[in-house]
């Protein structure tokens, strides 16, 4: 089995994380930068935009998310939501994934035949970037999971970190030192998911 496939297997959703340093913050920045540069995008659009939050900035994101959810989740059932936010906040940092809609709209105008496809391709490209960063972090011992509290938090995130209006929030990836093993991952039979014709 190739090294790359082995590295893919290391990536799991890790929810129990702490602020303790596994790799330096600078190393996290290097991983994210390399991933942003080298993850493919349709028409080489390079529409991905990423923000990395550490320390108090990371904490602030999950405080914002908690208070945003508090306003819409019934008080008598808010407990589990609050616990989940606390778990994400317990991590060392968060990667925020965006897609620049100005780039996408420019491609739609330039290649009108594919107009309806560009938003879909943009999401697919973002998914690849998320996977690359997630897998790279996992292989350096960093636990992470992928969250989607957009569009509920979009406006407040934009205001707090002065995010350009054209950047559409796609996903949030809290990360940190794993403090518990992920549960066993069940697999459906590969025969039901893969067909080969020769």
What are the residue ranges of the model-derived segments?
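Short, surface-exposed, charged loop/turn segments at secondary-structure junctions
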Residues: 66-67, 109-117, 187
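Small-aliphatic-rich amphipathic alpha-helix that forms the alpha element of a beta-alpha
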Residues: 35-36, 111-159
């Amino acid at each position: 089995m190739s090294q790359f496939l082995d590295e893919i297997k290391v990536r799991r959703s890790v929810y129990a994380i702490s602020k303790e340093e596994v790799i330096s913050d600078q190393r996290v920045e290097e991983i994210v930068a390399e991933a942003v540069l080298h993850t493919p995008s349709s028409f080489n659009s390079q529409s991905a935009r990423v923000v990395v939050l550490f320390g108090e900035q990371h904490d602030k994101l999950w405080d914002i998310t908690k208070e945003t959810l508090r306003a819409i989740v019934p008080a008598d059932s808010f407990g589990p939501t609050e616990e989940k936010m606390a778990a994400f906040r317990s991590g060392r940092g968060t990667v925020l994934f965006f897609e620049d809609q100005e780039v996408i709209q420019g491609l739609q105008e330039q290649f009108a035949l594919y107009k309806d496809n560009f938003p879909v391709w943009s999401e697919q490209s973002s998914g690849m970037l998320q996977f690359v960063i997630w897998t790279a972090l996992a292989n350096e011992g960093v636990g992470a999971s992928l969250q989607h509290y957009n569009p509920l938090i979009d406006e407040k995130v934009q205001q707090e970190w002065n995010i350009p209006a054209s950047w559409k929030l796609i996903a949030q990836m809290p990360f940190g030192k794993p403090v518990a093993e992920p549960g066993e991952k069940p697999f459906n039979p590969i025969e039901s998911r893969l067909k080969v014709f020769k």
